[in-house]
């Protein structure tokens, strides 16, 4: 009898564990996951975490739950926990491009440029990744931060080729402008800064870079217009303050 009880007790954890994979458990996990995602979209990251942690109890092996846990932790400023969750998501789904991309962004935040680039490359290795322009843009910025301008330009140009109408288009052209500016190719820098501000006039950092580049070629009239745009869209920011200083220096 005692042997039977011991056998049953040893088997119970297996039974209980397997029960968490039932359709009912998956349905419950989806309910909490859906609530968590909605709360993330509303910017309520703490409440989102509560829902997602409940979802994890019902389906701990769902990579999507860990992915959104990572996003919620980012929203709360808990970077290390976010890294752990994205790694869990990837361990459960190796070709999870979105998780690789987010992990790369976190590595960039830590200035781990090579690690970030490796994650973006893994994201891009997935042929059915829906938004490759995001990882290409991020990869370009990581290369730029390393002062590897050749690869930075290649990645940004690929982003434009893959998705010319991307929501990131103004940012991509701004970054290409910065690459050319650092290489003293002022005409190309101005061209790309102009594209960026034409697509998004409120992109005030690009407006400032444009104005400063115009100053380098002594085009004070266009520089003045660019600085005035910075002040219009972001008067109290560091960019706005710098634009005011430039305007005061222009005679």
Tell where the protein language model's regions lie, with residue ranges:
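Terminal, low-structured helical/coil segments at or just beyond the last alpha-helical repeat
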Residues: 28, 167, 216-251
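Canonical tetratricopeptide repeat
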Residues: 34, 68, 75, 102, ...
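Register position in tetratricopeptide repeats
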Residues: 41-42, 75-76, 109-110, 145, ...
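Helix-start (N-cap) detector for alpha-helical repeat units in TPR-like alpha-solenoids
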Residues: 28-30, 63-64, 97-98, 131-133, ...
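Structural marker of alpha-solenoid helical repeat scaffolds
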Residues: 24, 58, 92, 126-128, ...
């Amino acid at each position: 009898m005692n042997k039977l009880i011991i056998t049953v007790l040893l088997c119970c954890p297996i039974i209980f564990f397997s029960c968490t994979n039932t359709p009912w458990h998956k349905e419950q996990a989806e309910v909490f996951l859906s609530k968590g995602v909605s709360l993330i979209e509303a910017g309520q990251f703490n409440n989102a975490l509560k829902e997602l942690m409940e979802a994890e109890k019902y389906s701990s092996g769902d990579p999507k739950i860990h992915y959104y846990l990572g996003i919620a932790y980012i929203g709360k400023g808990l970077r290390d926990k976010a890294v752990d969750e994205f790694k869990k998501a990837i361990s459960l789904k190796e070709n999870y491009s979105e998780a690789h991309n987010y992990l790369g962004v976190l590595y960039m935040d830590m200035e781990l440029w090579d690690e970030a680039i490796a994650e973006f490359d893994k994201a891009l290795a997935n042929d059915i990744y829906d938004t490759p322009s995001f990882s290409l843009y991020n990869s370009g910025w990581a290369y730029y931060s390393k002062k590897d301008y050749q690869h930075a330009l290649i990645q940004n140009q690929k982003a434009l080729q893959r998705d010319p109408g991307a929501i990131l288009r103004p940012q991509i052209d701004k970054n290409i402008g910065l690459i050319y500016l650092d290489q003293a190719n002022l005409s190309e820098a101005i061209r790309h800064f102009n594209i960026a501000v034409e697509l998004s006039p409120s992109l005030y950092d690009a407006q400032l870079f444009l104005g400063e580049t115009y100053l380098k070629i002594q085009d004070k009239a266009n520089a003045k217009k660019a600085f005035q745009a910075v002040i219009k869209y972001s008067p109290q920011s560091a960019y706005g303050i710098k634009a005011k200083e430039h305007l005061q220096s222009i005679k």
